[in-house]
Amino acid sequence: MTRSLKKVPFVAHHLWKKIESLNIKKEKRVIITWSRASTIVPGMIGHTIAVYNGREHLPIYVTDRMVGHKLGEFVLTRTFRGHARKDKKSRR
Protein backbone atom coordinates (compact mmCIF):
# COMPACT_ATOMS: atom_id res chain seq x y z
CA MET A 1 0.00 0.00 0.00
CA THR A 2 1.37 3.43 -0.90
CA ARG A 3 1.66 6.40 1.41
CA SER A 4 -1.29 8.80 1.50
CA LEU A 5 -0.96 11.94 -0.63
CA LYS A 6 -2.04 14.04 2.37
CA LYS A 7 1.18 13.15 4.16
CA VAL A 8 4.63 14.47 3.34
CA PRO A 9 7.41 12.01 2.40
CA PHE A 10 9.44 10.71 5.33
CA VAL A 11 12.99 12.03 5.58
CA ALA A 12 14.97 11.59 8.80
CA HIS A 13 15.35 14.97 10.51
CA HIS A 14 19.12 14.70 11.03
CA LEU A 15 19.64 13.76 7.38
CA TRP A 16 17.51 16.64 6.10
CA LYS A 17 19.39 19.14 8.30
CA LYS A 18 22.73 17.99 6.84
CA ILE A 19 21.45 18.24 3.26
CA GLU A 20 19.94 21.68 3.81
CA SER A 21 23.19 23.01 5.31
CA LEU A 22 25.17 21.65 2.34
CA ASN A 23 22.68 23.20 -0.11
CA ILE A 24 23.00 26.59 1.60
CA LYS A 25 26.82 26.42 1.50
CA LYS A 26 26.75 25.07 -2.11
CA GLU A 27 29.01 22.26 -0.93
CA LYS A 28 29.25 18.63 -2.09
CA ARG A 29 30.35 16.10 0.52
CA VAL A 30 29.57 12.47 1.32
CA ILE A 31 26.78 12.25 3.91
CA ILE A 32 26.84 9.13 6.09
CA THR A 33 23.46 7.82 7.26
CA TRP A 34 21.79 4.76 8.74
CA SER A 35 18.32 5.91 7.65
CA ARG A 36 17.38 3.46 4.90
CA ALA A 37 13.69 4.36 5.26
CA SER A 38 14.14 8.00 4.21
CA THR A 39 12.51 8.99 0.93
CA ILE A 40 14.65 10.70 -1.70
CA VAL A 41 13.35 14.23 -2.30
CA PRO A 42 14.41 16.78 -4.97
CA GLY A 43 16.69 18.62 -2.51
CA MET A 44 18.98 15.58 -2.40
CA ILE A 45 19.73 15.53 -6.15
CA GLY A 46 23.45 15.78 -6.84
CA HIS A 47 24.58 14.70 -3.38
CA THR A 48 26.40 11.49 -2.50
CA ILE A 49 24.82 9.68 0.45
CA ALA A 50 26.55 6.70 2.09
CA VAL A 51 23.80 4.32 3.25
CA TYR A 52 24.45 1.55 5.79
CA ASN A 53 23.76 -2.01 4.59
CA GLY A 54 24.38 -3.78 7.91
CA ARG A 55 28.12 -4.11 7.45
CA GLU A 56 29.41 -0.95 5.76
CA HIS A 57 28.29 2.38 4.30
CA LEU A 58 27.89 2.25 0.52
CA PRO A 59 27.93 5.58 -1.38
CA ILE A 60 24.94 6.40 -3.59
CA TYR A 61 24.97 9.35 -6.01
CA VAL A 62 21.40 10.71 -6.11
CA THR A 63 19.96 11.47 -9.56
CA ASP A 64 16.59 12.86 -10.59
CA ARG A 65 15.26 9.40 -11.52
CA MET A 66 15.63 8.27 -7.87
CA VAL A 67 13.20 10.86 -6.47
CA GLY A 68 10.30 9.19 -4.66
CA HIS A 69 12.19 5.99 -3.86
CA LYS A 70 13.70 5.02 -0.50
CA LEU A 71 17.45 5.13 0.17
CA GLY A 72 17.43 1.47 1.20
CA GLU A 73 16.25 0.36 -2.25
CA PHE A 74 19.65 1.14 -3.74
CA VAL A 75 21.80 -0.67 -1.16
CA LEU A 76 21.42 -4.44 -0.94
CA THR A 77 21.69 -6.05 2.49
CA ARG A 78 22.26 -9.62 1.33
CA THR A 79 24.88 -11.05 -0.99
CA PHE A 80 23.74 -13.74 -3.42
CA ARG A 81 26.38 -16.47 -3.68
CA GLY A 82 24.56 -18.61 -6.27
CA HIS A 83 22.42 -21.72 -6.15
CA ALA A 84 23.75 -25.14 -5.17
CA ARG A 85 25.33 -27.12 -7.97
CA LYS A 86 23.52 -30.15 -9.33
CA ASP A 87 26.21 -32.81 -9.42
CA LYS A 88 27.18 -35.78 -7.29
CA LYS A 89 30.28 -34.17 -5.77
CA SER A 90 28.36 -31.30 -4.21
CA ARG A 91 25.78 -33.61 -2.56
CA ARG A 92 28.37 -35.44 -0.45
From Swiss-Prot:
UniProt-listed PROSITE patterns: RIBOSOMAL_S19
Write down the InterPro entries for this protein, in alphabetical order. Ribosomal_uS19, Ribosomal_uS19_bac-type, Ribosomal_uS19_CS, Ribosomal_uS19_SF
Q: Which GO terms describe its molecular function?
A: rRNA binding; structural constituent of ribosome
Q: Which SUPFAM superfamilies match?
A: Ribosomal protein S19
- Which terms under GO biological process does the entry name? ribosomal small subunit assembly; translation
Keywords of this entry: Chloroplast, Plastid, Ribonucleoprotein, Ribosomal protein, RNA-binding, rRNA-binding
State where the protein is found.
Plastid, Chloroplast
Q: Which Pfam families match?
A: Ribosomal_S19
Query: Which cellular component appears as one GO term in the record?
Result: mitochondrial small ribosomal subunit
Q: Which Gene3D superfamilies match?
A: 30s Ribosomal Protein S19, Chain A
Q: What does this protein do?
A: Protein S19 forms a complex with S13 that binds strongly to the 16S ribosomal RNA.
Q: PANTHER family in the record, alphabetically?
A: RIBOSOMAL PROTEIN S19P FAMILY MEMBER, SMALL RIBOSOMAL SUBUNIT PROTEIN US19M
Task: Report the family membership.
Answer: Belongs to the universal ribosomal protein uS19 family.
Name assigned to this protein: Small ribosomal subunit protein uS19c
Q: Which organism is it from?
A: Psilotum nudum (Whisk fern)
